[in-house]
Swiss-Prot record:
It is a multi-pass membrane protein. One of its GO terms (cellular component) is mitochondrial inner membrane. It comes from Avahi cleesei. Belongs to the complex I subunit 4 family. It is found in: Mitochondrion inner membrane. This is NADH-ubiquinone oxidoreductase chain 4.
Amino acid sequence: MLKIIIPTIMLFPVTWYSKNSMIWINTTSHSLMISLMGLLLLNHPSNNSNNFSLNFFSDPLSSPLLMLTMWLLPLMIMASQHHLAKEPWFRKKSYLSMLITLQMFLIMTFMATELILFYILFEATLIPTLIIITRWGNQTERLNAGMYFLFYTLTGSLPLLVALIYLQSSMGSLNLLTINLWLKELPNSWSTNLLWMACIMAFMVKMPLYGLHLWLPKAHVEAPIAGSMVLAAVLLKLGGYGMMRITIILDPTTKSMAYPFLMLCLWGMIMTSSICLRQTDLKSLIAYSSVSHMALVIVAILVQTPLGFMGATALMIAHGLTSSMLFCLANSNYERIHSRTMLMARGLQTLLPLMTTWWLLASLNNLALPPSINLIGELLVTITSFSWSNITVILIGLNMLITALYSLYMLITTQRGKLTYYLHNLNPSLTRENTLMSMHMLPLLFLTLNPKIILGPTF
């Protein structure tokens, strides 16, 4: 545990004491070494958890998410270099400090044993994210996006705190390791239903559930590149992880209470996919596609079967890497043509052929082409939801079709077609960008060879 936390804390002096010319190379290489040390966490000889201390542990569910969090920091630092180029050194260093703080909170959130500690760290991730969005975003609307993000998350999370304090007083402990050993079934009453709602709502807002998703497109569109990456790749996964952890306590109630939410997810999944077909703004399209993918994860978790949990974990990891890569690609377009409108960027295949290769790979992963882990996740979710109700196959099949449509629509609109007349002196694709894309793509390709390390605790 400390072999990850202490080097992460040491990134602060590395950032602030590095020479100005060495800031990027030092932080990137240091954070990459931390993420390689974290690979040891993925080794679970048995299906048990590794208990580092009384407060922190990792198990087959949290270790893939931990690995994703650690892998993302060097990528965010690499992606941010261009848009911070004209900022003064102090601001560059404070931006990096925010990213490192966020990384530290996220690592501890995924490792927490106590649910109250998990809640505190879950809320703490809000602060650095908010500062990144409202300070380094592009347009003035970033303040509005920050307000949405803050109030949606806070309003959703307050009932969870009350519910956790109530559970603590009634059960005596909220330790995740012991709680399922002496768990009493919750009584079947309306107050239990309220407790279930209070516990689940915070994670539903974070995921986000269709209907509570309005903060997500705003936050994604206005955030700088690192903000978008960490938001899509890790912060949405906090919701899924929290739901998997807390549904253990709410055992029999979920079966009856999940119906309206399952309906809403299946409906919202198709709605948000359809919205993607009508988008002109590239970042907004990727944000809405995140909502539709996360709806699948909510379905998988609420059906409450081992296969569902496996599918949800696989889909979360796959989506984390894929959507982060899509945001990087959108950002590399934005740095060249200074517009997020897709039609403005058409015909880039002739100018940047290598970037088109990355666009193709990212789009194919997004539409879950075999044998990607996106497909493995989606298949497991489909099997799970089919066991719950046969009709869901039609809805999930329709969603897969629309996902394929908007992924290819995005690819064709940005890469094919005639060049717009004002694109004549573009920068070529940089080695930094190609490295960044390959570092997103390689884990996705390698995981197709051995997906069981990210299939969670039930494999």
